[in-house]
Amino acid sequence: MSKLFSFALVWVLAFGSSLVTAAEHPNIVWITSEDHGPEMGCYGDKLAVTPNVDALAKKGMLFNLGWSCAPVCAPARTTIITGMYPPSIGGQHMRSMVNLPAQIQFYPTFLRSQGYYCTNNSKTDYNVNQQTTGWNESSNKAHYRNREKGQPFFAIFNSTISHESKIRVRPHEKVLDPAKVRVPAYHP
């Protein structure tokens, strides 16, 4: 029995890393939609018309308990891409452009070391001075479809339609009746 166990242990140690399944390396899609709250159909907003996001939420993962560590786009992206609380690295203010300590890497760097194909389409403003080398592609044409067959991927797609800079485009038409919009209790 101990010889069988020893053989099994040696086999797992020698070949175990090649037995990775898709569940252990799931594909990851990060869709950035900035500067808004949970006003989407998948979160129960009856006025929101968000059929594509709703379909993704139904088939994928929907976070029901989340918050932003930063109230504006670039510092929030810094938090997500580094996993760091913004004040802990000096990135809490818009346009902080901090120098990250060498031991803090963007997580696509780690994912690439694990065999992932990493794409960024296409915001590169992470509120830090360094640019990551964690991408296989980073442009408005970057896409996970360019990876090797069977290779797991991490893909960021950035939507700009909800970005704060878009709310000042004039003239604009009212899409909803303001009287029907639910104002969260934390607003005055």
Where are these regions (language model features)?
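Bacterial N-terminal signal peptides
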Residues: 6-18
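Formylglycine-dependent sulfatase
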Residues: 2-5, 19-188
